[in-house]
């Protein structure tokens, strides 16, 4: 059955949203404001999934996708939407999530943080499959919502130097002894180096090693090998162990890392994000600053150039060891401290044990920082960091943690905005600023919140009685 629909909005999977007969329809390929004919492909009791058959009235924000694989490859979802409109949708999603999850509205919306929209992806995980029906070996991202590997010949979100490797990598894998036992190639680009990590399930032969070395010499890359878990990753050539690094030129820092270490996908946006975070924190020379979920010290080392002391805490000892080494190499050893701890299990006693911090930066993974937020909420007004900057890759967990800090912890949500870390995808990276309130203001806000809750309960009771 073909229906005609008016598209009202867009979700973060880049599906148009419409309503019909009390049901929500998610429409693949449609944009807000468009009038389209659709074919339903899946029916559920409360919603349907449909795909566009014809765009009768296109959106002014619709653009031609640059990539010939768009729509099949799962690497991108929004190439058909103008970049500024993509960011606007993410900003609206962030604000909506703050309200629906945390009943919060930022006092100020920060301008979006933009960077390159093409060739930005300096980290990628490429799947490898032997598919005789498609000519042999495929190397690329998965097809959208599928375990199949897309038949990719180029990729515009990868740097051109990596995109050009997709077809040569196919030929190289095909020449190996067991191409069907090499399921993955991870890509990590430093400012000067391309590293490829080959996952192999069987031992490599001397012939395989020769093929890898010939490929490296021809294409100017470095190979690392992984036979089992992450701890088995090692460079093919020993002298390449410390070649991978990114820079933070504003702070005069070079940050070495291993291809298995967490680093931001988008180097240009990372530099801009670090700069903005430090400006928002407004660190003074006498300040003591905490950097929680510090990783390699991406924020800790820049913070140490501005404050009296920067303390980085992270769950991975390998990362804190490398952060400590980088700090020493840059002459920041006396102004930094690093600790290894599971930040998902901390409490207020632990937080008090670290001593007082004037400022705090929190940059957790998608799981957020709920335990940290709860610990902060139990501090007395004089114990709290005066300002906190929270960098997030999940609006849902950010809103959850923000609600704890604001409704229970005596903080105000001063500002928030999106960081366009992943153009053409639905991933929302964001940054938020919290400021500690004085005790009188906190008590007043809590009393107002209790009064509103009572009024809402009374309204619901009256409605039920009627």
From Swiss-Prot:
Q: Which residues form the TRAM domain?
A: 1-54
Annotated residues that bind S-adenosyl-L-methionine are located at 264, 293, 298, 314, 342, 363
Which GO terms are recorded in the biological process aspect for this UniProt protein?
rRNA base methylation
Per UniProt, which keywords does this protein have?
4Fe-4S, Iron, Iron-sulfur, Metal-binding, Methyltransferase, rRNA processing, S-adenosyl-L-methionine, Transferase
Q: Which cysteines are joined by disulfide bonds?
A: none
Show the InterPro entries listed in the entry.
Answer: 23S_rRNA_MeTrfase_RlmD, MeTrfase_TrmA_AS, MeTrfase_TrmA_CS, NA-bd_OB-fold, SAM-dependent_MTases_sf, TRAM_dom, U5_MeTrfase_fam
What is the protein name for this chain?
Answer: 23S rRNA (uracil(1939)-C(5))-methyltransferase RlmD
The species is Bordetella pertussis (strain Tohama I / ATCC BAA-589 / NCTC 13251)
**Encoded by which gene?**
rlmD
